[in-house]
Amino acid sequence: MKNYAIILAAGKGTRMNSGLPKVLHKVSGLSMLEHVLKSVSALAPQKQLTVIGHQAEQVRAVLGDQLLTVVQEEQLGTGHAVMMAEEELSGLEGQTLVIAGDTPLIRGESLKALLDYHIREKNVATILTANAKDPFGYGRIIRNAAGEVVNIVEQKDANEAEQEVKEINTGTYIFDNKRLFEALKHLTTDNAQGEYYLTDVISIFKASQEKVGAYLLKDFDESLGVNDRLALAQAEVIMQERINKQHMLNGVTLQNPAATYIESSVEIAPDVLIEANVTLKGQTRIGSRSVITNGSYILDSRLGEGVVVSQSVIEGSVLADGVTVGPYAHIRPDSQLDECVHIGNFVEVKGSHLGANTKAGHLTYLGNAEIGSEVNIGAGSITVNYDGQRKYQTVIGDHAFIGSHSTLIAPVEVGENALTAAGSTIAQSVPADSVAIGRSRQVVKEGYAKRLPHHPDQPQ
């Protein structure tokens, strides 16, 4: 039997008060829609459609060209949204999942369990339900004395007794595909909202004595639908708990999980120590035995084994085994630090390659530089790489020694084993094994200070 899927992503999300479509708001680095698509993939649907409407082009851009979309020009309810898929799916044999694109916490395993239950029970429709402590706002699952599902009643249409029901509709269903589209033809807008409710399909099936079931979620959190920023923050907290728990089970030490932000795309090897207030985002990969200390931020970077990052920012860069960074360093995009490089406090590296065992300990800027192995960069040294229009490269050979407060004006090259004297401005290349001194000769005027206003011998 074939599986199909319809993801509902056409809503405006008015309560988000945002210029961004609701389903594109992110939870742990991925849009809500991407989380849903990832979970839906567990069913391996033969055909999958996403119903888009509000700011359709933005949503389509996230989906890419590989996934089918249909446009709901007017948002006339969930039933109307599913009707938009009729041309693609009507008449096909199989089961169809219908799920909202603003439910980022639903797990693929739960959707698979829902499908298995639907097939096993031979239902024409199966509702994914959950027990809510506070069911306000949700559609209620109404059962008869035998425990069979009779109806789904929306909050605005529920009477007092129905509002006391704790079992709620999560908005996720499995339908017999052919019967779904047959039933949709009988929907009306005779309700408090004046919309086509998808839930009315259940009443249609019950009226024709077809079997409708409900599969109860074990974890209510999975049912969370995000309609405002409060729910978005709630989803973020829950997702972070999941992500951090899995990393800890995999052998990562998080000193304070509640104060550690790790996006879902990040990979961390066992025996890594992550201190509090650390943020790890994007395609970051961290090797075993590395230590990331309090307050560090790492984005789209690959760190080898035994790397230590102390209160620093690393973006779009590659750090080999044994590299140490910080405190208060900034490794900017397109930088590569080879084995055992040391970047100390208040050092900024941008678009540069530093060879093995090279050290830049203090107060340094290295931009657009190709630096060899075992080079020492003295405190306060700067590569001057930008003339206001173009950027130029600085090349420093192996074993070179750059004296403190050297200014290297690119394009310039310092050869292997060469040395620049402290305080030098280097505007011409320095050959290998040479010493370059580029500073004014010191002049001492003995006794002259006594003539200056600051001197204690001067009258005040």
From Swiss-Prot:
Acetyl-CoA binds at residues 379, 385-386, 404, 422, 439. Mg(2+) binds at residues 102, 227. It is found in: Cytoplasm. Residues 251-460 are annotated as: N-acetyltransferase. Its cofactor is Mg(2+). Pathway: Nucleotide-sugar biosynthesis; UDP-N-acetyl-alpha-D-glucosamine biosynthesis; N-acetyl-alpha-D-glucosamine 1-phosphate from alpha-D-glucosamine 6-phosphate (route II): step 2/2; Nucleotide-sugar biosynthesis; UDP-N-acetyl-alpha-D-glucosamine biosynthesis; UDP-N-acetyl-alpha-D-glucosamine from N-acetyl-alpha-D-glucosamine 1-phosphate: step 1/1; Bacterial outer membrane biogenesis; LPS lipid A biosynthesis. UDP-N-acetyl-alpha-D-glucosamine binds at residues 8-11, 22, 72, 77-78, 139, 154, 169, 227, 332, 350, 365, 376. One of its GO terms (cellular component) is cytoplasm. Binds 1 Mg(2+) ion per subunit. Keywords: Acyltransferase, Cell shape, Cell wall biogenesis/degradation, Cytoplasm, Magnesium, Metal-binding, Multifunctional enzyme, Nucleotidyltransferase, Peptidoglycan synthesis, Repeat, Transferase. This is Bifunctional protein GlmU. Its EC number is 2.7.7.23, 2.3.1.157. The active site is at 362 (proton acceptor). It comes from Streptococcus equi subsp. zooepidemicus (strain ATCC 35246 / C74-63). PANTHER family: BIFUNCTIONAL PROTEIN GLMU, NUCLEOTIDYL TRANSFERASE. Catalyzes the last two sequential reactions in the de novo biosynthetic pathway for UDP-N-acetylglucosamine (UDP-GlcNAc). The C-terminal domain catalyzes the transfer of acetyl group from acetyl coenzyme A to glucosamine-1-phosphate (GlcN-1-P) to produce N-acetylglucosamine-1-phosphate (GlcNAc-1-P), which is converted into UDP-GlcNAc by the transfer of uridine 5-monophosphate (from uridine 5-triphosphate), a reaction catalyzed by the N-terminal domain. The gene is glmU. Coiled coil: none annotated. Homotrimer. Residues 1-229 are annotated as: Pyrophosphorylase. GO terms for molecular function: glucosamine-1-phosphate N-acetyltransferase activity; magnesium ion binding; UDP-N-acetylglucosamine diphosphorylase activity. Residues 230-250 are annotated as: Linker. It is an enzyme of class 2 (transferase). One of its GO terms (biological process) is cell wall organization. In the N-terminal section; belongs to the N-acetylglucosamine-1-phosphate uridyltransferase family. It catalyses: alpha-D-glucosamine 1-phosphate + acetyl-CoA = N-acetyl-alpha-D-glucosamine 1-phosphate + CoA + H(+); N-acetyl-alpha-D-glucosamine 1-phosphate + UTP + H(+) = UDP-N-acetyl-alpha-D-glucosamine + diphosphate.
